[in-house]
Amino acid sequence: MMKIRIAIVLFLYCAATSVVYAHGKADADAAGNNNYTGTIYLYGEQHGVKKITDKELALWRAYYTKGLRHLFLELPSYTAEYLNMWLREKDNTILEEVFNDWKGTAFHNQHTYHFFMQIKELCPQTVFHGTDVGHQYGTTGERFLRYLESKQQQNIPAYLRAQEIIQQGIAYYNGGNAKAMAYRENMMVQNFIYELKQIQNDNIMGIYGSAHTDTAALDSTGAVPCMANQLKSIYGNNLNTEDLSPLAKDIEPIRIDTITAAHTDYRAYYYGKQDLTGFKDFAYREFWQLDGAYQALKNSGKTGDWLPESNYPMKVEAYQVYVIDYTKIDNTKMRLYYISEGKMQNRQLITENIATE
């Protein structure tokens, strides 16, 4: 059965993608005669960070108390529908199955699992809405269709909609290039519009990766306006956004070391390591901030190598010096020094590599 479905969807793939690729952005006509009078509260996140999911849960509980019930998520429609079924069940079998399907993604972590469990306990009348393309179409998507088939519900809107979203997922995963990324961004807009139309003028809250929630930004490829940018052009002041992702960098140093730079010893605040698996020749990199080193090193020669704040696990501050040790797969190390002079690029601080000797 699944092979037949996939074959049909693949047959439609070229037509489905060429229209969106040709336009370069989601079809604004999909919004129809927009007369939405509710309020959209959109929050950007870094997936799977406890401090952020805790904040999102607190926000949703506050909105829930005020009467909001509709929570939009960066998930396919069928995943959201499946989770809505789970909210009505006594056990957690459905959540366990969906969570298992998320293995290998940023959603497969205990913080996200706890988030959903808390919603079931504290906000049981929540209605999830998924507006992403068909991720996990061969697992969650197929299981959702089989469930509805077992209930003889092949003609209900949720079943037909799931088939459409599976088609989007196959189109996206068969794209394999920047066009596929732009396609996904545009589909997220159209899917958002679709879901919003289902609830008339109710206020809603949404949680998405921060790459999708900047009302002035392009998508990750720079090809099309990102989701929130496009939604802003449709819903105007009805759309409110806030980026929660900086909370992920609001961390304390793990320990204090001593690092010598330009013949001077400095207190070095260590913030941990980042895995570089997948980068040729490198295993991981580690980060320090040198306390009080800026004045001594501000006139050091610059190499022209820039590193934005998004590369750091902690907040980057202006007028500071940072040390990054790169460890290669052969266990050799390379130490680089970066200085922050308050320069901004794409709304974030950037650091520049300096020569300390």
Question: Could you describe each region identified by the protein language model?
Answer:
Residues A7-S18:
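Bacterial N-terminal signal peptides
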Residues M1-I6:
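Positively charged n-region of N-terminal signal peptides that target proteins for export
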